[in-house]
Amino acid sequence: MDSSAVTVKGLSLIDFCSTSSFKYRGHHELSESCSLNKKEEEPMLTCEHPETPSLGSPNSAVSPSQIMKSVSLRKEKDKSPELCETPKLRRKKCTLRRRLDFSFPLLKGDSDSQSRSLESNISQGVSLEKHLPGSTSGFPKEDNFSPLVTSTIKTEDVVSNSQNSRLHFSQHKTSTIEDSKDNCGLFEVECLSPIEGNDFKDSITHFSDSSLSVSDENTCPELLGSCGSQTTYGADVTTSVTPVSSLIAKIKFNGNQTLDSSGEVRDSLFTPEDSGFCSLSWDKSEDFLSDQEGSFQELLQKHRVTPKVGDQVKKPKHFGRLRRLSTLQEQGQSEDEMQTVHPNSDSGVLESLQGSEEKRGNLALSFKDLSNTPALQLVQELFMKSKRKRSQQEDDQEFFEDRDEGKIARLQRVLAGLIGKKMGIEQLDILTELQYRNLKHILAMVLESLTSESLYSAWNVSRNWREIVAQDKKANRRRKLYIIQLRASAQGAAVLRVQDAATRLCLLSRLALRSVQAQAQAPSGEQVPTLSPWGDVLTPVASSSLTHLRSKQEQYVKVARTLFTDEALKPCPRCQSPAKYQPHKKRGLCSRLACGFDFCVLCLCAYHGSEDCRRGSAKARGSKDVLPGSAQSKRNLKRL
């Protein structure tokens, strides 16, 4: 037996290659549509799917003429098929998706498993077809099925036919509930995505179901890798001829068992990195995550849980929107990636295997894959808001620490209207705070209550208070008047002390007796009562009898107690009472208040100041004058 072929037309091959898309009704149709063509030299098994089934008749009968036609077309085609554009089917309505939970465990046996007898498998297939009912009612999950067909075709043909199988697989789209309701076209320009080939780069990108995902745990990688197909189409008829290579030899139908997604199975995946299968797998994962409507943590937990059969039956609520989003993302990624991998080159296969492994390991659940999910957009927005708050807090901390004038001024403007910001401070400048708040009427009331001396003192406190007093015209006028009074009083005090100052400046010893001299000084300008030489207040009668009451010596002793160090006593030329005179000025003054003669010591005349004395009269008068205590004065006393 040289070779064996299996012809699967249209949608049945997609249901055959996809694990999670197998359902009970699909399996019944597959069993019913299988026809056996047995020859003596070259046995052949042909399986055909009904030609574009309508909604009313999903399972139409297959005539022998169609079987012969498919076989003849298979022989006429070359072994190296060419890639062609995806045909646009004209059917408007599609039946519900038929899935069957089958897994395709790999058989690692030797060539003995590939050389099984075709007759036994055919008999098993015939018996299986008899037992299956024609209705589409429920099919039990627990039944186990043995391989329908095995073939001994050489493994070299797998490499050439695998890419054609994937192309054929990607060009078909299974029906959904939404398509049946909306009566929408299945194949449109918007649903095409680039898949690299010989003549074109456009094909279906998004299949909107977990059955087309390479990363699904129920998908058999070798089945997807070993499928091959050729498509010939006309106006209304599409014919698919698929050779059965190691596909049947390595696949065993088991409805009760699921294939574990181990590293060994993933390594056997024969798909380049830029093929349609990788895009399907990642699109499926994105759709699965974008369907979630819960929180982000629930989304992560649901993504990590192994998908069950019941979960796969559920369809996305918004299938059309998700399909368009995935298609746009697929086109954007294909435009960015300009590198192409030849499907028949070994090096390209190895690089694609490594790239797909890295993609599954790193991009299994990343933010890039979840860019279409509303939950991730919400999480990213919250993260950016928290980041802005942290940066704002850091900026505020730097703002308080920085001593730049601009930033400090900005802070002062912000805190200017804060009430109670000065609480707890021991010393507070109330006038400055009132001026800062432009409360001039309150400042006017405060300054009006102050005295002129207080205003003068406030002027000298600080520059701010000086500005405050200067702004109030009334208070500033009072301050100026007080300054004028101070100056006038200072000049008057200086005039009063001019007479004593002339003598005091000559002697350094007067500094020690200044307090005593102040007591002897009598203020001028006021009416001083008549005093005796001893300081008693005298009436005019008492003053006339003064000479009679006291002796002249007692008078001299009384006046001598009030003399300064630079003064001396001398009798008055008129009344002979004790008179004080200053030797350096040559001027004398009678101590008796009734006389009070101011005279010149040289000429004994009225004091003439800087003018020259009259010498004659002075000498004559001088000859008569006798110094007290002299011999002449003693003789005069004796004579008296």
Curated annotation (Swiss-Prot):
Disulphide linkage map: none
Q: Which InterPro entries match?
A: FBX5_43, IBR_dom, ZF_ZBR
The PTM Phosphothreonine maps to 176
Cellular component per GO? female germ cell nucleus
* Phenotypic consequence of gene deletion: Both male and female with knockout of the gene are viable but sterile, consistent with the fact that the gene mediates metaphase II arrest but does not interfere with mitosis. The absence of the gene results in the arrest of meiosis I progression in spermatocytes at early diplotene of prophase I and is associated with a decrease of CDK1 activity.
Question: What does the record say about PTM?
Answer: Phosphorylated on Thr-176 and Ser-275 in response to calcium, which is a prerequisite for ubiquitination and proteasomal degradation. Ubiquitinated in response to calcium, which promotes proteasomal degradation.
Region described as Disordered: spans on this chain:
328-354, 615-640
Binding partners and assembly: Part of a SCF (SKP1-cullin-F-box) protein ligase complex. Interaction with SKP1 does not occur. Interacts with ANAPC2; the interaction is direct, ANAPC4, CDC16, CDC23; the interaction is direct, ANAPC10; the interaction is direct and CDC26, during spermatogenesis. Interacts with CDC20.
Q: What is this protein called?
A: F-box only protein 43
Source organism lineage? Answer: Eukaryota, Metazoa, Chordata, Craniata, Vertebrata
